[in-house]
């Protein structure tokens, strides 16, 4: 690995790693772009929850054996909306739409602490509003069919559900890091759709695997918004899983990408050795 670092230094790079975000960047609180990004995260999460939870309720409301979109259609709704919304908001807020993604990027020093906290609050509020619209438009089936809330399915243990959420979120956040890696972005800059596409597809694939277990959280805002509006005891009993699992998965993905794939620790050591006066 150290050989790779030394060779990279000799031959130069065709990309530039952005500097790490400061932990407390209070200056950005004075910028309109900061608040514009928060609004973008709020609206994007609202739209995400409205479309996806409405799809879930609409499917469950069908009575025929061939009615509704099925598990595959639900997975496409979640993955497709992430693809669309990341494409629309990436240039404004980064297109997080998920506190676990924001947490992972914060750990990797991609965003500051104030921005991370503001994003998470906006995402949770947007999720509540999005599910609130679903309840307002589909009141009767919403109450009868579970409100799109995440719960542990019958036959699965809490540990299994937690593990599924950790692995599912790891897949998502790892894909986010890989799709937005500076090296990849520089070499694929002529195809701007490449970052949102694998992220949306990762969400789609994880839903296929995890819907039978937990309904698929991998997004604490999605789970929180549905739990708040549905306000059912079972949803709240299981709710901690949909925060702990995604945050642990995001932590693991950030560590794997930054310290194993990108060898951040080795590069920092090499930089220190080449500049001993720093």
UniProtKB/Swiss-Prot annotation:
Cytoplasmic side: 1-36, 96-116, 180-192, 262-278
Assigned GO CC terms: plasma membrane
Extracellular side: 58-74, 138-158, 214-240
Example GO molecular function: water channel activity
Major subcellular location class: membrane
Expression by tissue: Expressed in roots and floral buds.
Function noted in UniProt: Aquaporins facilitate the transport of water and small neutral solutes across cell membranes.
Note on domains (UniProt): Aquaporins contain two tandem repeats each containing three membrane-spanning domains and a pore-forming loop with the signature motif Asn-Pro-Ala (NPA).
Protein known as: Probable aquaporin PIP2-8
Phylogenetic classification of the source organism: Eukaryota, Viridiplantae, Streptophyta, Embryophyta, Tracheophyta
